[in-house]
Structures are given as C-alpha cells and as structure tokens.
Design a protein with these regions (language model features):
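Bacterial carbohydrate/catabolite-sensing allosteric modules
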Residues: 1-68, 76-316, 321, 325, ...
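A secondary-structure capping/hinge motif
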Residues: 328-335, 376-389
Length: 393
C-alpha cells in the first residue's frame, strides 16, 4: 500500500519542455512523470516544441515553479524567466549566458555509452575500432569519440576517426563522398561506432556505396535505439540504449531539490545505459568476422617470431584452411600469405627506423629466414634499399 502524506501547501509545479519527436525526450518525459506519480506534492505539465501560442499563455497563468529543458540559449533562458520559473534543470547542456535562476544539469554518461559499444566489438574479437561523430561536432559526440578512442587503446586495438571535410556544412554530397572513401579504406574487419542512430544510418549507406559487407567486414552500432531508424535500415541497426527514463527521474529530483533547498547551483549528474539492442548490423551469424579476427590476431602475435604457415593460421582461427582463405580474402581484401608478409615487413621497418640493429640481423628478427629474399622483397615493396630506408627515417 502506498502512503500519500497530507499536503499542507500548494504542490510544486514542474514544466517539462522537451522535444517529443525524439525517443530520448519521450522517455525522459516518462521518467519525469514517474517521479511525479510517486511524489504527490509535485505536478507536471509537458510543453513540447511547436506548442501553440495560446497553450504557452496557459502555462504562464499556471505559474510553474521550475522547468526541465533541453535548450540553453539566451532567448530560451529569457522566455523561461518570463514564465516565472524559479529554477531550471538543463538536459545535456549548460546555460549559454549567466542565469538568474537556480539551476543544475543532467547528462547522459557518454563514457558508459562508448564502453557499451566497445564491449560489443570486443566480444566479437574485433581488433579495429572506428568512430563517426556528428557533422556539427556536438560536445556529447566529441566526448563519446574520445572515450571510444581510449577504450580502443586500452584493448590494444587500432583506431580511426572520420573527420568531416571543412566544407561539409555547405556541401553534404562532398561530406558523404568522403565518408564512403573512409569506410572503404578502413582495416577489415572493424567495428564502427556512430555517435547517434541518424549518423549510423549514414555509415550504413556509405558502406553500401563502398561495397563494404555488413556485418562480415564492418559491424556498426548507433546510439538511442530510435526504432523508426534502426528497424528500417538494411541491414537493421544495432544501438546502445541510454537510460533516458532514469535521466528524466533524476532531472525531476534535482529540480525539486533546487526549489526546496538552499543551493543555487547543483553539480552535474549523469544517467547511464540500459544495454545494447543487437540487430543485423552486428550479428555475424556465420562467424566470418570473428574467424578472420582470430586469424589476424595470431598473425600479429607470431608472424615475426616464428616460421608460421597458412595451415597454422587456419588452425588458430578454428576453421578449415579452404574456408578461412575464402573468408579472409572477402573480409580483408588480401590473402593470408600477404597478411603474414605485411606483418613481417612492418617489423622490418620498425627495426630500421627505431633501432640500430645491424641490417644483416633484421631478417631473422622479423620472421624472414632468407636475407637475400627479404632485400629483394623490400626493394620491390618500398622502392629503396633497407639501408636507404634507415637513412631517410
């Protein structure tokens, strides 16, 4: 049985000004309403973008005590003050100018969002991570990208980030063409984390244009689980689900604290992640990407320290040689032998540029048993001798 205390004063009136077309805002509004449902001394009204003018006038007459909103520009602040609000809680933003009222802010935990995406890719044994942020480089997008970069480094994975061309805002076609080139050049297989679902759709379109197979060559994850996007893309889109409802509840809780307490400012608070909804963009049902990733990991580990064969690589991948050869070529664009050779040549270049190891010993330290063969191969690949390479690097 729920106990409702007897109210001795007028209930607090909270106004939620959120964009109802977005799932995030709808679920946050639900969290705010849930707070009011279990706190009988609180009343809530919802005020969305596009609300008719006469309805806004009704809110002024209603005299809200505080407001929860997702915009913090000067015009919005002045309008909020015109409603007579004594306090405000901003969602994923801070006031653009000094505010006379009491205020606090609640943010999605962008580090937790990035971590959820990274865990999916790590669980698929992907060794190459990539990030695509918003075109406008929003602060929350930058924060997600930075966190994802750190997680990739901590996992020993390569990392790439798409940078929109400077003219992207004026030429969308050029920006999307650059994205097509970028996804085509990524090392495969890879996991691409997009800052939001709308941006993830751009990635899926770019992969289709670049003939990058999803999920065999690239797995893609967005954020927000906007079902009108995620269920209609081809393939369907996996997405991280922030706990928006919890965020709304926290926002209401903070607003009441501002209205009933003595503090004029509250420190930033965050809400976390519910989980990840996996759909076809990360569902490698045949295990192709995982098989190739295991093969690549084996090559990176042993190619330069022992005389490994393609049969050894197939055994380490848990696949037959014939199947691995087929899938390795399809996913990476190169053969297993080419991958072994590339790993060894990378070690040669590293020893030449970063150490004083005698050239006569470098072949053996890099997995090449025949120095004469190495010298010919090196010249063919780089267009110079090993000695000249060292001198220039």
């Amino acid at each position: 049985m729920v106990y409702y205390p007897q109210m001795t004063s007028r209930p607090l009136r909270l106004l939620a000004h959120l964009y109802a077309m977005q799932k995030a805002s709808r679920e946050m509004s639900g969290g705010i309403l849930h707070y009011a449902a279990i706190h009988p001394d609180v009343r809530v009204q919802l005020y969305g973008i596009g609300t008719p003018r006469h309805r806004r006038e009704e809110f002024r007459v209603w005299k809200p005590d505080g407001i929860i909103l997702g915009a913090a520009d000067e015009a919005t602040l002045r309008a909020v003050e015109g409603l007579g609000c004594r306090a405000a809680v901003f969602v994923n933003t801070e006031p653009a100018v000094p505010a006379a009222m009491r205020y606090g802010s609640v943010y999605c935990d962008n580090i937790a969002v990035a971590d959820a995406a990274a865990r999916v890719f790590s669980g698929k044994h992907l060794g190459n991570f990539a990030f695509v942020g918003t075109r406008t480089c929003d602060a929350w997008s930058v924060e997600r990208g930075s966190a994802f970069r750190r997680l990739a480094a901590a996992s020993g994975c390569s990392f790439s980030e798409f940078k929109s061309p400077p003219t992207a805002s004026a030429n969308l076609r050029r920006e999307l063409a650059a994205l097509v080139d970028w996804v085509g050049a990524l090392p495969k297989p890879c996991g691409i984390f997009a800052a939001c679902d709308a941006r993830a759709k751009d990635v899926l379109d770019a992969c289709a244009a670049a003939q990058v197979l999803i999920p065999e060559q690239a797995m893609v994850i967005g954020v927000d689980d906007e079902e009108f996007i995620c269920r209609q893309t081809l393939p369907t889109l996996s997405s991280v689900v922030p706990d928006f409802s919890r965020g709304g509840y926290i926002a209401a809780e903070m607003l009441v604290e501002l209205l009933t307490g003595n503090r004029r400012r509250l420190p930033r608070r965050t809400f976390g992640v519910q989980g990840v909804v996996e759909r076809m963009s990360t569902s490698d049902t045949r295990g192709t990407g995982r098989m190739v990733s295991r093969a690549q990991e084996f090559i990176r580990t042993y190619a330069t320290s022992s005389d490994i064969s393609v049969e050894d690589v197939a055994k380490a991948s848990g696949s037959s040689l014939r199947l691995l050869q087929k899938n390795f070529k399809a996913v990476t664009g190169s053969t297993i032998c080419d991958a072994i050779q590339t790993a060894r040549l990378s070690k040669v270049c590293k020893l030449l540029s970063e150490t004083l190891t005698p050239i006569g010993q470098i072949g053996e330290l890099s997995g090449f048993g025949n120095n004469a063969y190495l010298k010919k191969l090196f010249h063919r690949r780089f267009g110079c001798t090993m000695r000249n390479y060292r001198a220039n690097h």
